[in-house]
C-alpha cells in the first residue's frame, strides 16, 4: 500500500495512471492532508450529516495557506519543486487549493461539482515568477457552492473552514477550536472536540491501520483514492479555467 503527500498527483493524467496501477496490483493508494487529522473537521462533518444540525448545505468556504514558501523558509529543494509549474502543476492553486477540494468532496459525500471557475494571480512576481501565489476556486453544485481560497499571501498561516446550511453555520477555526450558530436569535456555541481515535489522528498511524487490515478506507474518505481523483479533476479544471477565464463544466 502507498500513501503520498497531497495532492495525489501533479496532473489528472498522472493520477489516472497511478489509479490504474493501484487497481492492477490491488493496493490502496492514499493521500495525506494535514487537515484529515483535524478533530474539528470530523466534528463538522458529524454535525452536518449525523446530527443534521444546520440543514441542507448551501455554502462551504475553505481558507488555506501562509505568507509564502520562500518567506517561511522551506528548504531549497522543496522550494524549487513548489515553484515549478511542470513539477507542481501550479503554485498556490495546487499547493493549497487541494485542501478545499478534498474537504468539499468529502462533505458533499463524493458528489462532483457541476462547474469549476478559478482566478489566479501572482502578487509577488519577484519571488514566484513562474507560478501563481493567489488562487480562488469556485465550485457549483445543484444547490450548493464552495469557495476555495488558496494563498501564499495570508498574513498568518491558516487551515480553516466555514460550513453554511439552511439553518445554521459551523466554523472550524483550526485543528482544535470550532463554533456553531443556529440563527440570529441563537448564541454562538464554542466547541473543543476530543482528539480523533488512534489510527485516525496521524498519517502513519492511519497507513499502518490500512496495511494491517484494521482500516478499510471508504471511497469518500479524505485519504481515499476516489475522493482524490475528484480533487485532481477539480484542480485540472481550475487550472484550465484560470488560463481561459471561463467556467469549466465537468463531464
Predicted regions located by residue number:
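Short helix-capping segments at alpha-helix termini
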Residues: 23-27, 51-53, 128, 139-141
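A short glycine-threonine-serine/GTX helix/turn-capping micro-motif
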Residues: 87-94, 189-198
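Beta-strand-loop-alpha-helix segment that lines the small-molecule cofactor/substrate pocket
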Residues: 1-36
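Predominantly a Rossmann-like dinucleotide-binding segment in NAD(P)-dependent oxidoreductases
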Residues: 36-127, 245
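C-terminal helix-rich "cap/oligomerization" subdomain common to oxidoreductases
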Residues: 24, 206-251
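Aromatic/hydrophobic pocket-lining residues that form π-stacking "cages" and hydrophobic walls in ligand
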Residues: 18, 44, 237-238
Amino acid at each position: 500500500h502507498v500513501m503520498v503527500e497531497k495532492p495525489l498527483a501533479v496532473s489528472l493524467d498522472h493520477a489516472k495512471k497511478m489509479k490504474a496501477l493501484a487497481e492492477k496490483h490491488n493496493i490502496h493508494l492514499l493521500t495525506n492532508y494535514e487537515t484529515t487529522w483535524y478533530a474539528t473537521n470530523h466534528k463538522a462533518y458529524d454535525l452536518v450529516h449525523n446530527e443534521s444540525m444546520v440543514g441542507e448545505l448551501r455554502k462551504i468556504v475553505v481558507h488555506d495557506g501562509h505568507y509564502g514558501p520562500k518567506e517561511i523558509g522551506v528548504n531549497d529543494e522543496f522550494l524549487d519543486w513548489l515553484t515549478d509549474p511542470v513539477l507542481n502543476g501550479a503554485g498556490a492553486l495546487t499547493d493549497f487549493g487541494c485542501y478545499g477540494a478534498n474537504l468539499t468532496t468529502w462533505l458533499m459525500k463524493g458528489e462532483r461539482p457541476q462547474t469549476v471557475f478559478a482566478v489566479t494571480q501572482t502578487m509577488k512576481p519577484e519571488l514566484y515568477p513562474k507560478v501563481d501565489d493567489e488562487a480562488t476556486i469556485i465550485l457549483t453544485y445543484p444547490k450548493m457552492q464552495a469557495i476555495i481560497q488558496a494563498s501564499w499571501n495570508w498574513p498568518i498561516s491558516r487551515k480553516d473552514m466555514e460550513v453554511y446550511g439552511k439553518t445554521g453555520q459551523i466554523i472550524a477555526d483550526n485543528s482544535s477550536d470550532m463554533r456553531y450558530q443556529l440563527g440570529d436569535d441563537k448564541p454562538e456555541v464554542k466547541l473543543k472536540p476530543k482528539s480523533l481515535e488512534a489510527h485516525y489522528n496521524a498519517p502513519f498511524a492511519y497507513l499502518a491501520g490500512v496495511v494491517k487490515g484494521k482500516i478499510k478506507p471508504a471511497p469518500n474518505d479524505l485519504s481515499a483514492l476516489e475522493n482524490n481523483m475528484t480533487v485532481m479533476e477539480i484542480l485540472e479544471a481550475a487550472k484550465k479555467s484560470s488560463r481561459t477565464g471561463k467556467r469549466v463544466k465537468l463531464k
